Amino acid sequence: MDGEGHDINIWGARMSPSPAAAPVSATRGAPWSGCEGCPSRAADRRCVCH
């Protein structure tokens, strides 16, 4: 599943253009706040840390 890595990059760039805003939004008391690798909700589904 090499496409998985590409999917995360595409989602991260589409949802959060700024890498700094990504972690901040995820830490806003969200269900995926424990996942620092997931910049957006869409990426959370592909992220291993649910």
Swiss-Prot record:
Endoplasmic reticulum listed as a keyword: no
Keyword line: Cell membrane, Lipoprotein, Membrane, Methylation, Pheromone, Prenylation
Membrane topology term: Lipid-anchor
Keyword Membrane: yes
Record's compositionally biased regions (Low complexity): 16-26
Annotated propeptide span(s): 48-50
GO molecular-function terms, A-Z: pheromone activity
Lipidation positions, renumbered (S-farnesyl cysteine): C47
Region of interest: Disordered: 1-32
GO terms under cellular component: plasma membrane
Modified residues (Cysteine methyl ester): C47
Subcellular location: Cell membrane
Purpose of the protein: Activates B-regulated development.
Listed name of the protein: Mating-type pheromone BAP1(1)
Organism: Schizophyllum commune
Gene name of the encoded protein: BAP1(1)
